[in-house]
Amino acid sequence: MRHLLFLCPCVIGVAFHLWLFNFSGLFSWFLVWSPHSYDIVVGVLSARHNHELRNVIRHTWLQHLNHHSSLSQRVLVKFIIGSHGCDIPVEDREDPYSCKLLNITNPTLKQEIESFSIPDSAAVITEHHVVNVNFRVLYPVVITRLGVFQHDSAAGFQRNITVKLFQTEHEEALFSARFSPASSGVQVNGIWYKPVEQFILPEGFEGTVVWESHDPEGLLSGNVHHVIVNDGGGIFRLTTVKEGLLPYEFTEGVEGIAGGFTYTIHEGETLLNTLETRPERIQNHLAALEKEDALLQEESTTFQDIVFVNVVDTYRNVPSKLLNFYRWTVQLTRFEFLLKTDDDCFIDIDNVLKMVAQKELQKENAWWGNFRLNWAVDRTGKWQELEYLSPAYPAFACGSGYIISNDIVQWLAVNSQRLKTYQGEDVSMGIWMSAIGPSRYQDSRWLCEKKCEAGMLSSPQYTPQELMEIWQQKERCGNPCACEDR
């Protein structure tokens, strides 16, 4: 036992010596692999198929950086690309901005379709005098009649009710029908209908049907989740509060259904042909995706300037692409500022670096860009925003180019799993930044629209050929917009 006690200090000493040796080796390894520190990391949002735009950047301002060692040591440029392409062809999606299948099956053709019916157990007289429901058209239809639920079949129609159909964000009804005891319309399957002027509601149309009682008594209506919806095989769908969507600003009353409308499917034969050719189209699309994946991997290996982020690469996922890139920068790089731009934008990187020095931007809580103020929220189209309640967005910088300090990137990266994404990355940034109140540096030289101005820092929406032309002009005469005749 005495010998064992004598040996213990020796064993501890050897172990401590080995620990010091291993720690010093680990520390040396950390120093070797410690990331290079940059003044600016540039993140270029790029769609998977935009090979030509990326190559133009590589042969213009990015090549200029790489040919000047002093600049290449200060600036790191990465293209941000989603790891996954959408596996649904554009023709078979609900809209071109997302990756959701247009799920139409067995459409009802060449006849009028009644949109809603209600079981007797689900229909109740409510205290509400105004009831509305929102819907989205997924394939073109023609509305033929508007209707209200039957109140008392024995006594005939004894109510005064107006039904109106609105296009979203429009205060004037597209068409309406007034029901009264003297003019009740035609009764079909428990609903009183009146014809309306017929015209085509296109794919993507966002509409609201509003029923209004002009009597002291409320409307006979049903909860949207208890009413039977006849969507013609997937031709339209309701957009309800349950899906997390907010009511449109002008909509009055409560959500519910107090009647219906009839409709026909427009150009049904074309729809049938589209559905019949879908399997072959999807097969060809998946084969094209495999080729695209291979080309992107080859491109990444060749140029070493792509960051693949784990999202499906669609317009609606651009905010998620950006948050994923912020996480990447924080984990694998060291920098003072981050510049975000798009692959169709001209960037005068020399001017940017010069202005960073001249402005003496604070290295904490700084956001330098060209800010849009009181920008109205769209409820339809490419920039449709259904989940932001306010009528206008907080101040946000135009997406063609802006710079944020490292600590803001750190905050975004740390909170990226909790931050809600909205319809665009620029407005999402404005909403996210409203929580921390950064110091905003307004500068109109980060152009918001496609135009060329001497001294500009960025300008958006160029074709590859146009980007090459303005860069060549800048190289020849120092002005990207024009070279003066000498």
UniProtKB/Swiss-Prot annotation:
- Alphabetical UniProt keywords: Endoplasmic reticulum, Glycoprotein, Glycosyltransferase, Golgi apparatus, Membrane, Signal-anchor, Transferase, Transmembrane, Transmembrane helix
What reaction is this protein's catalytic activity?
3-O-(N-acetyl-beta-D-glucosaminyl-(1->4)-alpha-D-mannosyl)-L-threonyl-[protein] + UDP-N-acetyl-alpha-D-galactosamine = 3-O-[beta-D-GalNAc-(1->3)-beta-D-GlcNAc-(1->4)-alpha-D-Man]-L-Thr-[protein] + UDP + H(+)
Where it mainly occurs, coarsely classed, is Golgi
The protein's Enzyme Commission number? 2.4.1.313
Topological region Cytoplasmic: 1-10
* Glycosylation site positions: 103, 160
Q: Which GO terms describe its molecular function?
A: acetylgalactosaminyltransferase activity; UDP-glycosyltransferase activity
Identify its membrane topology class: Single-pass type II membrane protein
Q: Which InterPro entries match?
A: Glyco_trans_31
Spell out the GO cellular component terms annotated for this protein, sorted alphabetically and separated by semicolons.
endoplasmic reticulum; Golgi membrane
Q: Does the keyword Ion transport apply?
A: no
What transmembrane ranges does the database entry give?
A: 11-31
Tell me where it resides.
Golgi apparatus membrane; Endoplasmic reticulum
Please indicate the ranges of residues that lie on the Lumenal side. Answer: 32-486
**Top EC class per UniProt?**
transferase
User: What protein family is recorded?
Assistant: Belongs to the glycosyltransferase 31 family.
Question: Which PANTHER family does the protein's record reference?
Answer: BETA-1,3-N-ACETYLGLUCOSAMINYLTRANSFERASE, UDP-GALNAC:BETA-1,3-N-ACETYLGALACTOSAMINYLTRANSFERASE 2
Q: What does this protein do?
A: Beta-1,3-N-acetylgalactosaminyltransferase that synthesizes a unique carbohydrate structure, GalNAc-beta-1-3GlcNAc, on N- and O-glycans. Has no galactose nor galactosaminyl transferase activity toward any acceptor substrate. Involved in alpha-dystroglycan (dag1) glycosylation.
Q: Specify the protein name.
A: UDP-GalNAc:beta-1,3-N-acetylgalactosaminyltransferase 2
Q: Which organism is it from?
A: Xenopus laevis (African clawed frog)
